[in-house]
Amino acid sequence: MATAAVIGLNTGKRLLSSSFYHSDVTEKFLSVNDHCSSQYHIASTKSGITAKKASNYSPSFPSSNRHTQSAKALKESVDVASTEKPWLPNGTDKELEEECYDDDDLISHSVEAILLLQKSMLEKSWNLSFEKAVSSEYPGKGTIRKKKIPVITCSGISARQRRIGAKKKTNMTHVKAVSDVSSGKQVRGYVKGVISEDVLSHVEVVRLSKKIKSGLRLDDHKSRLKDRLGCEPSDEQLAVSLKISRAELQAWLMECHLAREKLAMSNVRLVMSIAQRYDNLGAEMSDLVQGGLIGLLRGIEKFDSSKGFRISTYVYWWIRQGVSRALVDNSRTLRLPTHLHERLGLIRNAKLRLQEKGITPSIDRIAESLNMSQKKVRNATEAVSKVFSLDRDAFPSLNGLPGETHHSYIADTRLENNPWHGYDDLALKEEVSKLISATLGEREKEIIRLYYGLDKECLTWEDISKRIGLSRERVRQVGLVALEKLKHAARKRKMEAMILKN
């Protein structure tokens, strides 16, 4: 037999001699091979192997195609080897050669069984390796978990629609999370302290309210003690008047303070919700929140838990009052009274009602609908004029740098508002003062200063004569001569333009 046949049979020999199975076919195959090579006789035992046909063979391992290809390659190598002339050693007899050719038929019959046996052995070996791999992934378990095959079901909705829906849901969740975080930051920006997110029960509110009431009674007692003593009482004096120790007094004050803080912090979100309704009406959000917190503290002090009302229902109106007052005080550059703000609100609502009916909202119709005089309506509408600073930028700057202000587009015709005019007056006074000091004598200086009011006192010739002790005519003559001296000196110093102008 050819070398290729020997190689193929040797491969089958290795497979058959493995530790998986041992049968009489193995012994027979080995005896035949040894007989052909070393002149031993073939055993007459028949094979007892029963194997399935290749058509009925359906391996459960996923790589069954590779098994089939390996078996097919082995069979092809054996078929090619069977067509070639078998190899015999030198010096063999003719009988031995015929005996080897008779054994070829037996080998061809056993090849089919060998191939089927190889398939089953490879399947067992691969299944064993797979079991080892699975057992290593899931240690401590005696049984091997089978892989679950996903079952695809049709839901009636396309995959694209499911992806779009999942994306929208994710975006909505992200926006909600961002809004919660931003609202929390906004509240923390206006309020100092830890904001309570848990809703207090009515029993807890009643307990805290009683502590706050006891603190208010303590403040009243302290104010009465201050009136009797005439000064602010110390902690020792207050504790003695209450017949308690100083430590008990401090613990009492601390409990009242903590109760007020806890009850206020649990209602901060209510303040924010009310303040947001008055946003964009001219006042800053921080001012509205501060006004609402002042109203909240006032409502907590006034709350009576014995009447059975919820604290949020009671403090709502106090918070609203505080926010509205903050709006009145901070919404305009020029503050308007509270009653005027209320009147403006009534006028605004009356205008909306008239416009809905298709009526032009004039002053007389608004006054008639509100049962108010036309003068009050006119005064309120005239007070609504907006006030803005001329130092503001006329146009928004794109590069962030300050641009032209309203002063560049609005001219002021009044001379006293011109800054250069004041500078000119000051320079003229200094020049005239130097000219008088350098040109005139003492009497002439006094007469000129009193007559022209250079010392902020303007007198007549007669008043000057009474003060100096000269006649009126003599004072007038001295004054006129002094004025001529000043004109002559001014011409020399080239001050004619200033003298003629002024």
Curated annotation (Swiss-Prot):
GO terms for biological process: cellular response to light stimulus; cellular response to redox state; DNA-templated transcription initiation; photosystem stoichiometry adjustment; regulation of DNA-templated transcription; regulation of RNA biosynthetic process. It is found in: Plastid, Chloroplast. The modification Phosphothreonine is found at T170. Its main location: plastid. Residues 57-92 are annotated as: Disordered. Keywords: Chloroplast, DNA-binding, Phosphoprotein, Plastid, Sigma factor, Transcription, Transcription regulation, Transit peptide. Residues 57-71 have a biased composition (Polar residues). Residues 1-23 form a transit peptide. Residues 461-480 bind DNA. A motif (Polymerase core binding) lies at residues 287-300. InterPro entries: RNA_pol_sigma-70_dom, RNA_pol_sigma70, RNA_pol_sigma70_r2, RNA_pol_sigma70_r3, RNA_pol_sigma70_r4, RNA_pol_sigma_r2, RNA_pol_sigma_r3/r4-like, Sigma-70_RNA_pol_init_factors. Changing T170V: Increased transcription induction of psaA gene. Belongs to the sigma-70 factor family. This is RNA polymerase sigma factor sigA.
